A protein has these predicted regions:
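Sec-dependent bacterial lipoprotein signal peptides
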Residues: 2-23
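Long, terminal "pre-/pro-" and other extracytoplasmic accessory regions
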Residues: 25-213
Length: 213
């Protein structure tokens, strides 16, 4: 009795297996269904410290003794800058051991003028020590972010901002003999040479320092 049933079951097994295969192939796959697409957010501007930290990490792989010399922003047409945040930033790092300097950029998107998304390292240049006014500074001295510097500068510039609401703003961070700590320079205008108004803010304390007209 058991052998007869077993034979009949084994005889029909290939047909049952084929039926299951064809059935599974004919049914639409659940994973193949169209999934709702997550909307892609447009690139947003970032603060100076956000960009600086990412450039610093890569600069350390170039030279463990790197020190920042300068941090500056530049505005992108496709990413609106706002309240101390910009679409792209540039930093210059120096290595006393290598006697070299190297420029890095960080951008939230690809842009004209050889601006690449993410961190991009430039070529090495010779550096034998401070030239001009700017000096390397310690990373720990950068405690105040660019948006905080803008807020401090804006408090001292309400009248100017009302009259020049649409004027571009960019940022420069450096250490010079003018002040004991690194200072943010919040600059209204397209370039330093053409600007008629800028405000210095201490990058370590957030204190207002000076207004240049």
């Amino acid at each position: 009795m058991w052998s007869s049933i077993g034979f009949q079951s084994s005889a029909h097994f290939p047909f049952i297996l084929l039926s299951l295969i064809f059935t599974s192939c004919s049914e639409p796959s659940q994973t193949g269904k169209d999934q709702p697409k997550v909307p892609t957010l447009p690139p947003a501007p970032v603060t100076g410290r956000f960009a600086f930290q990412r450039m610093y990490i890569q600069a350390r792989t170039w030279a463990p003794d790197v020190q920042p010399l300068r941090l500056s922003s530049f505005n992108l047409k496709q990413v609106a800058s706002a309240a101390g945040k910009c679409g792209a930033w540039q930093a210059i790092f120096v290595s006393p051991q290598k006697s070299k300097a190297r420029t890095y950029t960080f951008s939230v998107t690809e842009s004209a003028g050889d601006v690449h998304e993410g961190v991009f390292a430039g070529r090495e240049e010779s550096w034998s020590g401070p030239r001009g006014q700017e000096r390397p500074f310690f990373l720990q001295a950068l405690k105040v972010d660019s948006d905080e510097a803008f807020a401090a500068a804006a408090q001292k510039s309400s009248d100017y901002i009302k009259k020049n609401a649409d004027m571009a703003v960019f940022f420069l961070l450096e250490l010079t003999p003018r002040f004991p700590n690194p200072a943010w320079r919040v600059i209204w205008g397209e370039t330093i040479a053409t600007s008629n108004y800028s405000v210095f803010v201490d990058a370590s304390t957030g204190q207002y320092l000076q207004t240049l007209r």
